[in-house]
């Protein structure tokens, strides 16, 4: 059975009342008035019962609130998220709301509560239980002005089998839902929600069939008299079974808070399970002990049996799995509530337990530990990842000591696995053991920026498989090294900075030796000296490209100057670290020199002085490939092993890659090469060469659309003749600039051209001059422009500057250099539009790469990048949301990726500079009104509350002189050092 812990699925629930079910089934029951022997009709009793329930519910809803919350950072086993749940007031004077622990969360929390009359108030967490699924939020009662807030009274003793109950909450995220049911069990073990997530244990749970779903977590379970008898906690996704937490220990915690007393929580680091007597007998329970227990507890079904005892815990080597708990401190035990009561009152004190092992009573003495002490209350941010001490939650599930550094967010430098982000334990960093968080902090504070250090780690699921890898220490993009600590007085996790970044160590030249390719032809074998590996690490999802590590082979264009060409899928923009690996031996940093706007290649530059190796400059072909040409394919597989094969060019045609739903870079307007050999489908990078070693084409990976949350990759070749002008500019020591006609083009057959109005003389001219393929080029889409003369979709291109357009290459960009002033080129187009020939003067543009972003409320804002302009006919604003972070106010209040922000507090924000000016004036923890436009040009407005403590406003921009990206904080709360 699949168990649903957090109850967040949005499924509609329709539950008939029990009375209605009885009537449908023809069920009748006799009711007699006291002192009377007259049977009352069923409808009379149902009517009275329903009226009492209506009166009760009308009172209860005054106490129930909808909790809108964000767990703002990944912590322990809980990911960052935004959600809704339920809570209810348990102390109206102090302003205390009871809800679930998985709502309050173990980590940082931000949220607000909405009462039944739609009054809103901020809430802060004041307590979350280390084990049991309950926590308390606090609000200011004086902020609720239009209703009399009522507290529900907790009556745990009224939860009995057969009791009729109502679950009053926000089921499936609705404002108010009332679900009916009957309590069927009061002695089931806590549900198991699976590994690597929060689980309650060492408590009884109450079971009922109420079919509650997402949003009902934290709902009060009330009886007909309006008393809260349990707390909604979880349920099954495959049945209408719900699990309620008993209120006994919750009531004790509430009284401690009301009396300003600490909520002590004791533990001997042992998990018990309630097992029925028949199982206990099989485990060795003696007949005498069973008889005594049944006599002492006539209504109980079994005893507690030890399930897990943690190593190095108070009960280690004293209690063993399968031991049956008989008594503690002379008090016979039959329930978890008794155990909790004794442990909580004896923290730091010795206790005496009697357990039965194979029919023999064994007396054990343990010192009760502090449960709060083994519950993490701080975490560290460094290198883009977050760490905390291993929690009792995780240690208990995997039966390991509560002592380790737990990687709660495997991102940034510590992204060990792109698929598995949770469950990693860091054992060593830089060959130094890290058994505790404090030791980890000491080790990390000594490592310079840009270092590569060895890390040993393992996963909780597989304790037997240690892993060793080398990680890149990023303290420049992710320069924060700080520790957050929970403050239960304010509800905020205060942070302090731990250490400033240590500057990177100077590079030293290193030697490397190439191993030639295993090819009999020596000229082809030497191609290995012209191929290097290019890898990238990106800190932010700029231009809507996921910030994941990428790697592929690149071709050296100029060994003396250190120029390398590689697929733009590997280097989508320049806001990242780029590295070149030479001969699988030497790793050196590189910088982005040139990004082609349409042809899917990037040129990067490394410092040749840092490498002492026989890197060679290839001979690049000046003759285009044709269909049927024989070439040698040299490529690299997914595990970066070189392969080679003789192959044939099978096709050269215009490229057509589908656009992604969220616009991002894709190659357009180029002639792509296909080959016969299947080896090309296994290689994401490589080259095509002649037998004399002349390089004819690049084999590149092209980023396509997302399918099932995975990027689709296309593999094709790019003729090196197409990049000849750019290479010549680079060899002269200059930086190229490309002006393009910013439209999308495709090809159509001669038949289609004739049917769409192309005159016969142009068709004859095409037939006489075309050498490779008979086709016409047509406009498939037009980028956003405010020019009067512009191309439109469906135009057929006849000529440009009186030159016949026979293929996509005839529309290539105009290459100039950056050392001369930019001049907007104008091209004379002759086209066929709706059957008529037209002449147009079309201006070319230089595509501007993104050079500035603003991070506000957890979303990344930038000017609309080229892919957005390619996809839209109208740009509503110069402030475009390209990404939004988990648990951010942007998600909580409704800013989506691909939205444009047009106004903030009714002030127009046409660009990022104006937007920054406006948001700088917005105070922390206040609402602002934001007007937006969707990608489909649908305007809407939201209100958003700022949270600068966890989501500061910052600006990241590229310095035009140095090319370095620099961050400036705009709105943030100070550290408490």
From Swiss-Prot:
CDD domains per UniProt: cpPDZ1_ScNma111-like, cpPDZ3_ScNma111-like, PDZ2-4_Nma111p-like
Chief subcellular location: nucleus
Presence of keyword Metal-binding: no
Annotated active site: 102 (charge relay system), 133 (charge relay system), 216 (charge relay system)
InterPro entries assigned to the protein according to its UniProt record, in alphabetical order: PDZ (IPR001478), PDZ-like_dom (IPR025926), PDZ_sf (IPR036034), Peptidase_S1_PA (IPR009003), Peptidase_S1C (IPR001940)
EC number per UniProt: 3.4.21.-
Keywords assigned: Apoptosis, Hydrolase, Nucleus, Protease, Repeat, Serine protease
Coiled coil segments of this chain: none
Domain PDZ span(s) in chain numbering: 271-356, 749-835
One CC-aspect GO term: nucleus
GO biological process: apoptotic process; cellular response to heat; lipid metabolic process; positive regulation of apoptotic process; stress-induced homeostatically regulated protein degradation pathway
Enzyme category, top tier: hydrolase
Region of interest called Serine protease, as start-end residue ranges on this chain: 64-254
Gene Ontology molecular functions: serine-type endopeptidase activity
The protein's name in its UniProt record: Pro-apoptotic serine protease NMA111
Gene name linked to the record: NMA111
């Amino acid at each position: 059975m699949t168990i649903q812990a957090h109850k967040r699925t949005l499924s509609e629930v329709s539950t008939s009342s029990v009375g209605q079910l009885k009537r449908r089934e023809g069920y009748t029951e006799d009711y007699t008035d006291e002192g009377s022997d007259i049977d009352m009709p069923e409808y009379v009793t149902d009517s009275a019962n329903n009226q009492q329930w209506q009166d009760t519910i009308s009172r209860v809803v005054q106490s129930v609130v909808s909790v809108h919350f964000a767990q703002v950072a990944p912590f322990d086993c809980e990911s960052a998220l935004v959600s809704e749940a339920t809570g209810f007031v348990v102390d109206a004077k102090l302003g205390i709301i009871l809800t679930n622990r998985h709502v309050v969360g173990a980590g940082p929390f931000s949220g607000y509560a909405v009462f039944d009359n739609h009054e809103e108030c901020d809430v802060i967490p004041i307590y979350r239980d280390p084990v049991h699924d309950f926590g308390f939020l606090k609000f200011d009662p004086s902020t609720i002005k239009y209703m009399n807030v009522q507290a529900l009274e907790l009556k745990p003793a009224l939860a009995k089998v057969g009791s009729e109950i109502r679950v009053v909450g926000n089921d499936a995220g609705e404002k108010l839902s009332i679900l009916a049911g009957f309590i069927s069990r009061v002695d089931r073990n806590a549900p198991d929600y699976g590994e690597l997530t929060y689980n309650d244990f060492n408590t009884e749970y109450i079971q009922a069939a109420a079919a509650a779903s997402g949003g009902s977590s934290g709902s009060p379970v009330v009886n007909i008299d309006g008393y809260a008898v349990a707390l909604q906690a979880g349920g099954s996704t495959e049945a209408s079974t719900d699990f309620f937490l008993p209120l006994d220990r919750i009531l004790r915690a509430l009284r401690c808070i009301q009396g300003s007393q600490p909520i002590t929580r004791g533990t001997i680091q042992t998990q018990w399970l309630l097992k029925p007597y028949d199982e206990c007998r099989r485990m060795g329970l003696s007949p005498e002990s069973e008889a005594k227990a049944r006599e002492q507890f006539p209504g109980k079904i079994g005893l507690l049996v030890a399930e897990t005892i943690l190593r190095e815990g108070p009960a280690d080597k004293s209690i063993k799995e399968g031991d049956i708990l008989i008594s503690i401190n002379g008090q016979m035990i039959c329930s978890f509530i008794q155990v909790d009561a004794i442990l909580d009152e004896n923290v730091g004190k010795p206790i005496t337990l009697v357990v039965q092992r194979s029919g023999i009573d064994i007396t054990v003495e343990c010192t009760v530990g502090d449960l709060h002490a083994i519950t993490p209350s701080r975490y560290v941010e460094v290198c883009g990842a977050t760490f905390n001490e291993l929690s009792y939650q995780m240690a208990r599930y995997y039966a390991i000591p509560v002592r380790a550094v737990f990687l709660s967010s495997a991102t940034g430098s510590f992204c060990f696995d792109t698929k598995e982000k949770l469950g990693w334990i860091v054992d060593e960093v830089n060959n130094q053991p890290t058994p505790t968080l404090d030791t980890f902090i000491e080790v990390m504070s000594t490592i310079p920026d840009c270092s590569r250090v060895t890390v040993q780690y393992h996963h909780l699921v597989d304790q037997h498989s240690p892993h060793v890898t080398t990680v890149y220490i990023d303290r420049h993009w992710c320069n924060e090294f700080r520790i957050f600590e929970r403050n239960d007085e304010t509800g905020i996790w205060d942070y302090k900075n731990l250490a400033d970044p240590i500057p990177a160590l100077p590079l030293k030249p290193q030697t490397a030796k190439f191993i030639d390719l295993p090819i009999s032809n020596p000229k082809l074998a030497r191609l290995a000296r012209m191929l290097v590996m290019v890898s990238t690490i990106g800190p932010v999802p700029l231009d809507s490209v996921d910030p994941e590590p990428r790697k592929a082979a690149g071709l050296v264009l100029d060994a003396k100057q250190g120029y390398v060409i590689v697929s733009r899928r590997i280097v989508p923009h320049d806001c990242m670290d780029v590295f070149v690996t030479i001969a699988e031996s030497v790793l050196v940093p590189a910088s982005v020199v040139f990004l082609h706007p349409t042809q899917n290649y990037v040129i990067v530059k490394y410092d040749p002085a840092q490498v002492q190796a026989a890197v060679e400059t290839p001979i690049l072909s000046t003759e285009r490939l044709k269909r049927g040409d024989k070439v040698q394919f040299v490529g690299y597989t997914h595990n970066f092993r070189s392969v080679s094969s003789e192959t044939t060019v099978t096709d050269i045609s215009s490229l057509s890659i589908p656009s992604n739903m969220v616009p991002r870079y894709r190659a357009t307007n180029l002639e792509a090469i296909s080959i016969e050999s299947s080896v090309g489908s296994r290689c994401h990078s490589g080259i095509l060469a002649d037998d004399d070693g002349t390089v004819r084409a690049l084999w590149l990976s092209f980023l396509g659309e997302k399918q099932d949350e995975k990027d689709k990759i296309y593999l094709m070749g790019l003729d090196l003749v197409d990049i000849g002008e750019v290479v010549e500019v680079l060899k002269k020591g200059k930086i190229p600039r490309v002006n393009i006609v910013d439209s999308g083009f495709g090809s159509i057959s001669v038949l289609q051209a004739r049917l769409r109005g192309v005159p016969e003389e142009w068709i004859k001219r095409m037939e006489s001059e075309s050498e490779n393929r008979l086709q016409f080029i047509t406009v498939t889409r037009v980028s956003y422009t405010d020019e009067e003369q512009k191309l439109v979709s469906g135009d057929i291109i006849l000529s440009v500057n009186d030159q016949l357009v026979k293929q996509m290459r005839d529309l290539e960009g105009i290459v100039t250099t950056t050392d001369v002033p930019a001049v907007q080129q104008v091209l004379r187009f002759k086209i066929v539009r709706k059957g008529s020939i037209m002449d147009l003067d079309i201006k070319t543009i230089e595509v501007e790469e993104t050079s500035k972003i603003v991070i506000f409320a957890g979303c990344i804002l930038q000017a609309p990048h080229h892919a957005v302009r390619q996809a839209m006919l109208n740009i509503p604003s110069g402030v475009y949301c390209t990404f939004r972070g988990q648990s951010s106010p942007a998600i909580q209040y409704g800013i989506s990726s691909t939205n444009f922000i047009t106004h903030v507090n009714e002030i127009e924000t046409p660009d990022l500079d104006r937007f920054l000016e406006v948001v700088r004036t917005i105070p922390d923890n206040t609402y602002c009104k934001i007007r937006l436009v969707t990608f489909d040009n649908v305007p809407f407005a939201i209100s958003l509350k700022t949270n600068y403590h966890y989501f500061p406003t910052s600006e990241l921009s590229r310095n035009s002189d140095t090319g370095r990206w620099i961050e400036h904080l705009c709105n943030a709360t100070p550290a408490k050092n």
